[in-house]
Amino acid sequence: LYASGLSMAAMMSLVFFGTLSLQCAINTFGQDIIVAHTAARKITEFFMLPFSVMGVTMATYCGQNMGAGKKDRIRTGIRQALILTWIWSLGMILLSYTASPWLIWLVTGSKNPEVLSNASWYLKTDSLFYFAPAAISVLRNSLQGMGDHITPVFSSLIELIGKVICAFLLARIFQYWGIIMAEPIVWILMVIPLIIKTRRLL
C-alpha cells in the first residue's frame, strides 16, 4: 500500500511539473492565447474525466483479481475498459468538431474570434488523440493494481521530459501550434511502455 501511494504521488508530481513547463511557454504568447488555452484545458479536463474514473476502477479491479490469480479476468477487464473509454473518445471527437465555439463561449463568455479560433483548434486537434490518454489511464492504473509501481512512474517521467522539450523547442519554432501538438506527441510516447509491460504481465 505504501509503495502504491508513493508511486502515485511521484506520478502526480511529474505530471504537475510537466504541465507547469508548458504553461510557462504559453504565458509568452499573449492574453488571447492564455484565455483560449485555459478554456480549452477546462473543457478537455471535463472530456477526460471518465478516463480518470475508469483508471481508479481498474486499479482496484486488477488488484483484487491479481491477488486471486485470475489474469484472464484482468485481460477481459482491461479490454472492456479500453472499449468503453474509446467509445467515449469518439463522442468527444464529434462534440469537439460540432460544438467547440459554443463550449468555449460557455466557459469564457468571450466572443473574441482569436480566443474561439485557437481554443477550437486545440480541441479539434487533441481530441483526435484521446484514444491514447484513455489507454494511459486504464493501463497505468491497471499496472499499479497488479503491483508494478515502476512502469507507471517511468511513463510519467516521459511526460515530464516530453513536455519540457516541447515547451522549449516546439513552442519556439511553431508558436501555439507547438503547444497544441505537445500533448498528443507525449501521449503516444507515454503509452508505449505501458502497453509493452501489460502484455508481458498478462
Feature locations, PLM:
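Short runs within selected transmembrane alpha-helices of multi-pass transporters and secretion channels
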Residues: 51-55, 126-145, 151-163, 179-195
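General structural feature for long, well-ordered alpha-helical segments within catalytic domains
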Residues: 2-9, 13, 17-22, 33-35, ...
